[in-house]
């Protein structure tokens, strides 16, 4: 919708320098707090546990402590996926230092999770990656990325319209996780003949 500028109210909005009136060009770090997760030895990550561990590409295992107590947006900082934007689907999780944790800065609290996730997916973080053998995104490079921020009213309307969808996604992802665990427990027993249907 941004390319065609077909946002709610676009018919009555003036376009100034290619940007709708009331929208602003800003650096990502002026809108969001962006910090690395914490280092965690792979020896401490288990296949089951209480808190999911988020690495560069999503959940990589479990750990007995959380370092993040809210659902957040992540930006992958290491590997081929550097610059990819992800979202945690758990309120309590451990975020490794292979990702940046993104939360709204003071004054931008209205940039809630559903908006932040979709908004940052449109930012070109891959353009500022460094490293030849292993691509990476650094604190210095990520802060050079500029974005066009819609006006507060439009962001609030977006968040209001999508927050229920986000809750539904979380609910279904948890069901998928539980069903996957059940499948992984039952399938070997069915194949070995330990249980029959």
Predicted regions and their residues:
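A short beta-sheet element
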Residues: 55-59, 63-145
């Amino acid at each position: 919708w941004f390319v065609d500028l077909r946002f709610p109210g676009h018919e009555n909005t003036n376009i100034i320098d290619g940007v709708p009136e009331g929208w602003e060009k800003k650096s990502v770090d002026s809108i969001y707090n962006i910090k690395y997760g914490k280092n965690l030895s792979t020896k401490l990550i288990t296949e089951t546990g209480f808190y999911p561990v988020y690495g560069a590409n999503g959940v990589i295992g479990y750990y007995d402590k959380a370092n993040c107590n809210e659902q957040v947006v992540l930006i992958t900082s290491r590997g081929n996926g550097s610059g990819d934007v992800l979202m945690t689907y758990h309120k309590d999780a451990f975020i490794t230092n292979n990702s940046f944790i993104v939360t709204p800065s003071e004054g931008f609290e209205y940039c809630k999770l559903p908006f932040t996730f979709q908004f940052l997916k449109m930012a070109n973080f891959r353009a500022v990656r460094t490293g030849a053998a292993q691509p990476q995104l650094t604190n210095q490079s990520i802060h050079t990325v500029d974005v066009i921020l819609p006006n507060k009213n439009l962001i609030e309307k977006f968040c209001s319209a999508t927050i229920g969808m986000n809750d539904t996604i979380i609910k279904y992802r948890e069901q998928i996780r539980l069903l996957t665990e059940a499948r992984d427990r039952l399938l070997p027993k069915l194949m070995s003949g330990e249980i029959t249907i």
